[in-house]
Amino acid sequence: MKHILKKVIAIATVVTMLAAVPAMDAQAAVVKYATYTNTRFTYTVKYPTTFQRADYGSGDGTKLFSKDGKAKATIWNSYGKTGKRSGKTVVATAKKNRKINVKKATKTECSYSYKMGKNTIQYCYVFIKNGEIAFQLTYPTASKKYYSAAAKGMMASLKKNKS
């Protein structure tokens, strides 16, 4: 009888632990956002509240960094020769310099990622419309689920800008 009871307890423990794993993963991907507003170029982008912010003196954008220094991002805007650029040309230029994983490449936007060494991922997104608004996000591979969710939220907020 003790033998059967031990097996039942062991199975119940394993089932409980397995049920908790997806819940932990789901919580890890929950991202809370703050909003960066650029008054010079009149655009806004949501960014994870886990980042601290330091704006560029030029007014072009901002730098973001995690408290532990393992993740960072930059958000910027530029005007100029954007009439000659598209998401496809941005990706083509990036491909010349490194092996990238293209997520999207259209006339008005592109996104791609690549590995920097074994433990770091860099994700880039560019939105082109009357100029370029972009962000670049660098993070440890161990935090991929969280920062992938963060990138999606940042992209969605960036696309809401009219210029």
Write out the residue ranges for each language-model feature.
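N-terminal targeting sequences that direct proteins away from the cytosol to non-cytosolic compartments
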Residues: 2-63, 68-70, 131, 138-163
